[in-house]
C-alpha cells in the first residue's frame, strides 16, 4: 500500500493566525448525557488559518470563490522541492529547475521546522518571476509551507498577481517537515464555501508506486 503523508496543520485554539485575526475556536452545542445521545459541535475559523487554499477571489474582486474553483488543480502528481537555503524570498537561482520539468503542481519547503506554536512574521516569500516561470512551464498550482507567497507587509501582492496572470492555484501553510523532496500525488481539496476567498484543506501526499 502506498505511503501517505498528512501535510496539514492541526486546527486548535492556539493555531497561529494572521496578526489581528480572531483565533480558531471549537464549541459544543450538545454533549452526550442523560436525554442527549450525541455530541454536536460548531467551529469558527479565519479562512486563512492553518493549511488552506487561496481562492482567486482573495486577490481579485472578479475571481472565483472557493465554491467555484475547478478541483482538478488540487489533485494529481506534484513535485516537492527543498528551498530551505532561500533567504527572505525564493528567487530564480534558489530552485533546481530540472525538478520542475513536467510537474503541474509544485510544493516548496522553506522551513527547517514548521512553526506550529507561534506566528512567524519572517516567513520566506516567493518572487513573482519564479511564479511566472512556473506558469510558463505549465504549473497549475503552487504550494508553500509559509503563511503566504508574499511578505506579511506586502501591499502589492506581486506573487499573488503573478498567480492570477498565470491562472494558477495556491496552497499555503503546508507542513512538509517529514517528506523527502521528490514526486508525489497531491490531494488537497477546498471546501465548497459559497463566496469564500479561501478554504481550509486536508492536504495529503501519496507515494507514487
Curated annotation (Swiss-Prot):
Pathway: Amino-acid degradation; L-tryptophan degradation via kynurenine pathway; L-kynurenine from L-tryptophan: step 2/2. Zn(2+) 2 binds at residues 54, 160, 172. The keyword Hydrolase applies. Zn(2+) 1 binds at residues 48, 52, 54, 172. The active site is at residue 58. Its EC number is 3.5.1.9. This is Kynurenine formamidase. It comes from Sphingopyxis alaskensis (strain DSM 13593 / LMG 18877 / RB2256). The lineage of its organism: Bacteria, Pseudomonadati, Pseudomonadota, Alphaproteobacteria, Sphingomonadales. The gene is kynB.
Amino acid at each position: 500500500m502506498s505511503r501517505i503523508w498528512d501535510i496539514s496543520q492541526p486546527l486548535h485554539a492556539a493555531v497561529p493566525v494572521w496578526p489581528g485575526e480572531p483565533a480558531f475556536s471549537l464549541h459544543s452545542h450538545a454533549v452526550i448525557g442523560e436525554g442527549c445521545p450525541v455530541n454536536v459541535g460548531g467551529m469558527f475559523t479565519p479562512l486563512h488559518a492553518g493549511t488552506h487554499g487561496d481562492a482567486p477571489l482573495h486577490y481579485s474582486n472578479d475571481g472565483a470563490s472557493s465554491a467555484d474553483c475547478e478541483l482538478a488543480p488540487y489533485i494529481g502528481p506534484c513535485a516537492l522541492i527543498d528551498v530551505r537555503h532561500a533567504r527572505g524570498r525564493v528567487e530564480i537561482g534558489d530552485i533546481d529547475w530540472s525538478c520542475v520539468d513536467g510537474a503541474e503542481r509544485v510544493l516548496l519547503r522553506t522551513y527547517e521546522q514548521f512553526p506550529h506554536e507561534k506566528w512567524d512574521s519572517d516567513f520566506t516569500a516567493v518572487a513573482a518571476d519564479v511564479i511566472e516561470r512556473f506558469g510558463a512551464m505549465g504549473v497549475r498550482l503552487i504550494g508553500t509551507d509559509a503563511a503566504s507567497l508574499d511578505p506579511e507587509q506586502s501591499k502589492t501582492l506581486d506573487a499573488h498577481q503573478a498567480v492570477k496572470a498565470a491562472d494558477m492555484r495556491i496552497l499555503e501553510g503546508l507542513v512538509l517537515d517529514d517528506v523527502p523532496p521528490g514526486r508525489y500525488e497531491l490531494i488537497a481539496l477546498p471546501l465548497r464555501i459559497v463566496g469564500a476567498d479561501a478554504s481550509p484543506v486536508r492536504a495529503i501526499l501519496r507515494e507514487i508506486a
